[in-house]
Amino acid sequence: MTGRIERGISAVAASPSVVSIGFFDGVHRGHQAIITQAVRRASHHQVRSVVVTFDRHPMEVVAPGSQPWLLQTLARRVQTLAEHVDLVVVLPFDDDLRHLTAEAFVEYVLLGPLQAEAVVVGRNFRFGHRASGDLDTLTDLGKAHGFVAEGVDLLADDDGSAISSTEIRAAIGAGDVARAAELLGRPHAVDGIVVRGDQRGHDLGFPTANLQIDPRVAVPAPGVYATVFHHPDGRALPAASSVGTNPTFGGQELRVEAFLLDVDEDLYGLEACLDFRARVRDEVRYESVDDLLVQMRDDVRIVRRLLEA
């Protein structure tokens, strides 16, 4: 399934719907449980399944500068959501939307062309100005306006803690990409454009694709990782990737660089996706280039073994 994507309520054709609402950063396993229940309800009622999401993190508007790192770009998040439902509606989270009361939000979002018959959200769902509305508010408004509100219990991990975007960001920030993948239900990935670097990797015999990443998106802690480079032509290419500043050469700028194990071709200008499968080691400053080369060859052997396992 690949659903339609519309920007703004006014672009949506009128039709009954079962709706789920949220920012859904990362579209992790907890989000997927909510959306799956919405799809199940929509199928039962023979209406379309809809996700309503927002073009930016609410904190970017409510308290600029305090917003967290994102787990996905908007384009990637919307694409992921569209794989699950019939329609994704992207609302601009601006001052007008921010100041809507809970009831005004319901009237604007749910009672127009979406014609909501049911609304499925997580039990911690908040909405309306200053997050004044909760699941009980939504339930009461549903009774008044003719839709059913359903709260889905937060999905818990094996240790009993609720799966959350916050926990996933913490895992990524610590370089624990395996843990992040468990919580997401897939590897953490970053999208970027391949740009020219300083050519040092090429000179050393390890040409790398330097990815220009959206600075708002979370990247793992500095280190070397086993990764898969998703070429826009559909190929999934094994890669040893580094996140860091190249301290051996006195670098300062954080970079994401991928050495493709079995491919050496011109990648400049391509839009690619890099997913992180396993952490290999920390970033280290080496005393000599020869020491670095020995380590890089070892890194490649380890990455190949990890990706073939």
Could you tell me what each predicted segment is?
Residues M1-A14:
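Histidine-/acidic- and/or cysteine-rich, low-complexity loops and terminal segments associated
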Residues G197-A309:
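Phosphate/ribose-recognition catalytic cores of enzymes acting on nucleotide-derived substrates
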Residues H28, L81, V119, A180, ...:
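Residue-level signal for inorganic ion chemistry
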Residues T139-T245:
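Glycine-rich, Lys/Arg-enriched anion-binding loops that position phosphate/diphosphate groups
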Residues R4-E6, V88-L91, V148-V152:
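General small-molecule cofactor/ligand-binding pocket signal
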